[in-house]
Amino acid sequence: MAKKSLIYREKKRQQLEKKYHLIRRSSKKEISKIPSLSEKWKIHGKLQSPPRNSAPTRLHRRCFSTGRPRANYRDFGLSGHILREMVHACLLPGATRSSW
């Protein structure tokens, strides 16, 4: 189980990303439209004004049951070992083990 502080920090990052999403998107569009380099640098400075934690690359998917940030499966929202345990216990409908 992940620490509560780490899960809270991740939620805070998600809120910041939602808040500054439009600012980032609009300034990126402006950069692509303007041909002069000096104006692009001005807009680039504006792009760096939001906080670092509002960048979408800082977000991690976390397991719903354990909060683990690694080895997550998007379809289920679970980490690998929890997914395996739930499939073995037949708790996930439609998930089958493959063997060959």
From Swiss-Prot:
Which keywords appear in this protein's UniProt record, sorted alphabetically? Chloroplast, Plastid, Ribonucleoprotein, Ribosomal protein, RNA-binding, rRNA-binding
Query: Which Pfam family is one of this chain's hits?
Result: Ribosomal_S14
Source taxon at top rank: Eukaryota
Q: Give one GO molecular function term.
A: structural constituent of ribosome
Which GO biological process categories is it annotated with?
A: translation
Q: Which InterPro entries match?
A: Ribosomal_uS14, Ribosomal_uS14_bac/plastid, Ribosomal_uS14_CS
State a GO cellular component annotated for this protein. Answer: chloroplast
The UniProt entry, under SUPFAM superfamilies, shows:
Glucocorticoid receptor-like (DNA-binding domain) (SSF57716)
Membrane-crossing ranges are none
- Where found, per UniProt? Plastid, Chloroplast
Q: Which family does it belong to?
A: Belongs to the universal ribosomal protein uS14 family.
> How the protein assembles, per its UniProt entry?
Part of the 30S ribosomal subunit.
Q: Which PANTHER family match?
A: 30S RIBOSOMAL PROTEIN S14 (PTHR19836), SMALL RIBOSOMAL SUBUNIT PROTEIN US14M (PTHR19836:SF19)
- What function is annotated for this protein? Binds 16S rRNA, required for the assembly of 30S particles.
Name of this protein: Small ribosomal subunit protein uS14c
Gene designation = rps14
